[in-house]
């Protein structure tokens, strides 16, 4: 037997189109050389955002045994110690490629609001901060709405459809950090895990890569640049 995910969002196509419109606007904001064109009006900073909860801090119970030959295997004892978990809240600026992290022991409304405050401090006042994000309850909670109301006009949210997280480009980044850094990592504490994750972000931001969306872009061809 094979399983599938039933589409239970009656507005799936509409919401998907809204996300793709944003990606098309981003595409049109670059010239042929890949440079960002000047905005004619209010600048819109678009951030692809999501949370990655439950990142485990795991310690070895015995040292790894290093390979004895150039092509040998590293051996690791099958027992380990769980030291707790961290949640990664992260966004990618779709114009610059910069990755923006926040680590927390939870991923509640208060954590999401803290991330919004980081964005608010990062981008100049008067510019719009547009987030592509999923329908997590923290993104629509009373606490979050209260914060947004106190910063009217500063943030715009574009929600992915239910079961449509694959439309959010941050998911590709989460896959990358899992492959390159988190899979198999061993640490002595949660603090070390946090330090190493933040260091990963510092390293990749030295040469940021702009993510480009390709799927169905040929169907979104009549939009004007978001300038």
What residue spans do the PLM features occupy?
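C-terminal domain-tail junction helix/linker
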Residues: 192-227
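Active-site proximal helix-loop segment of RNase H-like, two-metal nucleases, encompassing DDE(D)
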Residues: 170-192, 205
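RNase H-like polynucleotidyl transferase catalytic core
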Residues: 75-80, 149-169, 185-187
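Charge-mixed, compositionally biased segments that are often intrinsically disordered regulatory tracts
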Residues: 1-82, 224-227
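Mobile genetic element proteins and their domesticated derivatives, centered on retroelements
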Residues: 48-50, 91, 97, 116, ...
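Electropositive, glycine- and tryptophan-enriched low-complexity nucleic-acid-binding patches
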Residues: 57, 67-127
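Short, solvent-exposed loop/turn segments at secondary-structure junctions
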Residues: 52-55, 61, 94-96, 136-138, ...
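Acidic, metal-coordinating catalytic cores used for nucleic-acid/nucleotide bond scission
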Residues: 107-108, 131-142, 162-167
